[in-house]
Amino acid sequence: MNPHQDPLWDRLSAFNFDDTGDALTFTQRLARENGWSLGFAQRIVEEYRRFLYLALRASHSVTPSDAVDQAWHLHLVYSRSYWDNLCAQVLQHRLHHGPTRGGQSEDDRFLDAYEATRDSYRRCFGSEPPADIWPEPEVRFAPQARWQRVDLAAHWY
C-alpha cells in the first residue's frame, strides 16, 4: 500500500467533509457532540480519512479507534454525503458499518482487527498512529469502559 501513488488516496485527499455553506459544519458538529476542541476534531477527520483508505486497501477487516468511529457514525447521518459522494464517487465502493454482535468471539474478532488496522497504518503511512486518537488495544477495549452518549446539559447535576 502506497497512498501517494494511488488514485483512491488522491480522491480521498480531495474530499471535503465540510460543506462551507453550512452554519454548523461536519467537523464543528463532530467537535460539539463529543466535547472536543475544533482542532482535535479536525485531526479526527484526517484520521477518519486514513481509516477509509485502509478499509479499502488493507487485506483484512479493519476496526477504527473510538474517536474515528464517532466520525464514521456522524458521517453516516449525513447520508447523501456518505453514500452518494463518499462511497459512490470517492471510494467507488459501498462501505458498510458493522457493529459488534456481542460476546467473547466478537470481542476477540474486533480486538484482532484493531491490532491489524494499527499495523497496517504503520506500514501504509510510515508512522505510528497518534496515541491520543488510536490508543493501545488494552485502552481501546478496556473492560471497565462503559460508553454512553449523554446530553450533559439535560442530565448533569
Annotated model-derived regions:
Residues 1-157:
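Intrinsically disordered, low-complexity, repeat-rich regions
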